[in-house]
A protein has these predicted regions:
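Extended substrate-binding grooves/exosites of carbohydrate-active enzymes
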Residues: 23-38, 84, 118, 123, ...
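Accessory carbohydrate-binding/adhesion or oligomerization-edge regions at the termini
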Residues: 1-37, 110, 114, 120, ...
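Extended acidic/polar, glycine-enriched regions
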Residues: 104-108, 177-259, 611-612, 628
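C-terminal beta-sandwich/jelly-roll accessory domains of carbohydrate-active enzymes
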Residues: 214, 218-225, 576-667
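Compact, charge-rich alpha-helical regulatory domains located at protein termini
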Residues: 662-734, 738
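Low-complexity, Pro/Ser/Thr- and charge-rich linker/hinge segments at domain boundaries
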Residues: 63, 137-154, 254-269, 628-660
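Surface beta-strand/loop "capping" patches
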Residues: 149-183, 549-581
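Accessory beta-strand-rich segments of carbohydrate-active enzymes
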Residues: 3-18, 40-41, 45-153, 157, ...
């Protein structure tokens, strides 16, 4: 029988390049747990060598086969046993295995796994707005199986595919196919389907060389996000009265569809998908999470009220997919085909392999309904090769899995007409109106116009959000002040935008959790993207979290916002409350100051006494309370110093421009730089780069330096294109930059 032995303990990690000390570690492990999000501006991208010993297990009959199973190694790896290469693997997010039987000997064997998180010419991701953690961050197993066993070699798959389809009479057909290595006439495969209580509801037997069967189950319990009923399909390889090998998969019976006018439906019930995106890291742990931490993340998302998760931008842990199956989410799973397209046969092969691994390894998960083929891939420009690769990925998805829908996440600047449309079944845009570009009020009209002009496209929003840092607060929040109040105000608006448009097939907040991005330095917090509804350590739910809980949950709740804005000045102060109840009553120091009937967001103006005040909000049977202190003047530490500095910097920028006519059409004289040149081209001239980098710093607070941080992602962009994505840029700013650039000769 199959034996799975964890090899997660007692590893020695060394670094051949000498850039880190040798250490003893247990798995899961990443060497970027700290520097991947600590704000130093860079992190270690190198090769680490993990080494430990093991004793190869033996099967009773003919010794069997021994496999090393790596649950993920970021980003490239080589597995060796006793100094001999067992396998190599490119890609940092999927399972892979190596048959090491013939490399093992009696007694102790040395297992070495060389892992690198450095870039390669053909690998994805190449450049993106998150940290590429290095290491064996999901664990390693030793698997012992008889010579005849369920497959362990095919793209890291589970050895069985199960396709449950509901029938009109209330039952379901389970089409099952298992894959047997070394089938024989005296071997059979026994299938058993068990309900959630472990009771067998149907079974069948097939020969080991032809294993496919369709089994009917009457009165099937359907799987949905509200009722995630699971069945367990067990496949047992038998020889006479002997069990040779056994595998199992949890599956669900459901049907779903998406239409442009009605959005998403599951089991015939219209159900707009409203949820979040998720990265897989935590503060000072990086991506080396335990199974319990993955489950806790899923529960935090469920408590939010979300019914969908976009798992960005790569294959996630089986622990998290299992949690989604059990708890109930509609999952968008995707590959790291992101930001910058790489030309050539090697890169094309790699991205196709990543899609094969994603689908084959995760086919049985009922929570997964959408395969995402790329994210913001036009940041680096468009080419026919890029478009063709998308068509190839779409075709591959349908060949491997015709039961699910495909989707794509367009960068905001993707033209609404063009070759990137009508490739996938569904489409979504990453829009940040109200943060990087435009105003939050543009989101609804943009959706309405796109829907009217493209009535045949199922449209969603795959990313939207803004930074919210719990140190910063304001009574008059505005874009780019990084306050918790502006983030909450933004999400109040966006939650209503999507509630008013059920035909938007899915919306995904960017992001559920703050996450590591070593290249970032924004809002006074370095090394992280702070758009999360929850902090990276999972300790603090920002006020914006409760906006969605008010919109998306049924269990009565009430939350008083602004509790970290604890010192207030002025005769009165606004107290904002979120609730999914119709009416909220507010008390200040035990006295009722108001009762309101509203939709999700309740605003009260209240006078505070000198010193500390107790604020209580009551909504039906639930209540919340906070303490506020009245002060003569609000402390300066509520305001991000850089916010005022940037405003002063922009003013000084215009002073330097002088009397230029910024209302005149921009000119682009031949032989001189302009805002139409890419950052890569501008970098060829020190003066031109300095002008462009200063403008980007003032507009976004990003430091742009060749070869550093997000340079690879942004080097193909022009200042003109960036201006379409940057919010709050003063009128005439891009014109003033162009006026200065056209003085610099190429």
């Amino acid at each position: 029988m199959r034996e799975i032995i964890s090899l997660n303990e007692n590893w020695t990690l060394s670094f051949p390049k000498g850039d880190h000390a040798t250490e003893q570690v247990n798995l899961p492990h990443t060497w970027n747990a700290v520097d991947g999000n600590d704000g130093n501006g860079s992190y270690l991208r190198t090769t680490g060598v993990y080494t430990r010993t093991f004793t190869a297990p033996k099967q009773p009959r003919e010794g069997g086969r021994t496999y090393v199973e790596v649950l993920a190694a970021a980003l490239n790896s080589t597995v060796k046993v006793n100094g001999q290469v067992a396998t190599t693997h490119e890609g940092g997010f999927s399972i892979f295995r190596a048959d090491v039987t013939d490399l093992c000997h009696e007694g102790e064997n040395e297992l070495t796994i060389e892992v690198s998180n450095e870039d390669t010419p053909s690998m994805y991701p190449s450049s993106a707005d998150f940290t590429f953690y290095g290491g064996l961050y999901r664990g390693v197993n030793l698997i012992s199986v008889p010579n005849a066993h369920f497959d362990l070699d095919y793209y890291g798959g589970p050895g069985m595919m199960v396709t449950p389809v509901p029938t009109e009479d209330g039952g379901a057909n389970f089409t099952i196919k298992s894959f047997v290595t070394n089938p024989a006439d005296d071997l059979t495969v026994m299938y058993s389907i068990e309900d959630c209580f472990g009771r067998e509801v149907a079974s069948a037997v097939r020969g080991s060389a032809d294993t496919e069967v369709t089994i009917y189950v009457p009165d099937a319990q359907l799987w949905s996000m509200d009722e995630p009923n699971l069945y367990t399909v067990v496949a047992t390889l038998q020889r006479n009265n002997e069990e040779v090998d056994e595998i199992a998969a949890n599956v669900g019976v459901r049907s779903f569809k998406v239409t442009p006018d009605e959005g998403f439906s599951i089991n015939g019930v219209p159900t707009p998908l409203r949820g979040v995106s998720r990265h897989q890291d935590r503060v000072f742990e990086g991506n080396a999470l335990t199974a319990e931490e993955h489950y806790d993340d899923a529960m935090l998302i469920k408590e939010l009220g979300a019914n969908t998760i976009r798992l960005a931008h790569y294959q996630h842990s089986q622990d998290f997919y299992d949690a989604c199956d059990e708890i109930g989410f509609a999952v968008w799973a995707e590959i790291p085909f992101i930001s910058v397209f790489k030309k050539g046969e090697g890169a094309h092969k790699h991205v196709m392999e990543e899609m094969k691994e994603l689908i084959i390894q995760n086919y049985n998960h009922p929570s997964i309904m959408f395969w995402g083929i790329s994210n913001e891939i036009l940041i680096g420009g468009i080419s026919q090769e890029l478009v063709d690769t998308h068509h190839d990925l779409e075709k591959l998805c349908k060949e491997l899995d015709p039961t699910r829908l495909t989707t794509i996440a367009h960068v905001s600047t993707t033209p609404v007409n063009g070759p990137m449309h009508h490739i996938t079944d569904l489409e979504s845009y990453n829009h940040y109106f109200g943060w990087y570009g435009g105003q939050m009020e543009q989101n609804g009209p943009w959706l309405d116009q796109f829907h009217a002009e493209h009535p045949d496209i199922c449209i969603g929003i795959s990313e939207y959000g803004c930074e919210g840092i719990i140190n910063w607060h304001s009574n008059t929040p505005q874009c780019k002040d990084y306050t918790e109040e502006y983030q909450a105000l933004y999400h109040e608006h966006m939650a209503q935008v999507f509630e008013d448009r059920p035909w938007v097939w899915a919306s995904h907040v960017w992001n559920m959790f703050d996450f590591g991005c070593a290249a970032r330095n924004e809002g006074g917090v370095s090394g992280r993207n702070n758009k999360g509804l929850v902090t990276m350590d999972r300790k603090t739910k920002k006020d914006s979290y409760f906006v969605y809980q008010a919109y998306w949950t049924q269990t009565p709740m009430v939350h008083i916002a602004g509790r970290r804005h604890a010192q207030r000045a002025g005769e009165t102060t606004e107290i904002k409350v979120y609730s999914n109840q119709d009416t909220v009553v507010l008390y200040v120091n035990g006295k009722e100051v108001g009762q309101q009937t509203a939709h999700r967001v309740f605003k009260f103006n209240a006078a505070l006494n000198e010193g500390f005040n107790t604020i209580v909000a009551v909504a039906g049977d639930v209540k919340d309370s906070i303490a506020l202190e009245k002060v003569a003047e609000e402390p300066g530490y509520y305001t991000l110093p850089e916010f005022n500095e940037r405003q002063e910097g922009v003013a000084n920028w215009f002073k330097q421009v002088g009397s230029m006519d910024l209302t005149a059409p921009m000119e682009f004289p031949e032989g001189y730089y302009s805002v139409k040149d890419t950052m890569e081209d501008l970098a060829k001239n020190e003066e031109a780069l300095a002008l462009a980098a200063k403008a980007v710093k003032l507009a976004t607070n990003f430091d742009i330096k060749p070869g550093v941080g997000m340079w690879d992602m942004m080097k193909k962009m022009t200042p003109e294109a960036m201006s379409n994505m940057i919010s709050g840029m003063p009128e005439g700013f891009i014109e003033s930059l162009n006026a200065q650039l056209i003085k610099v000769k190429k």
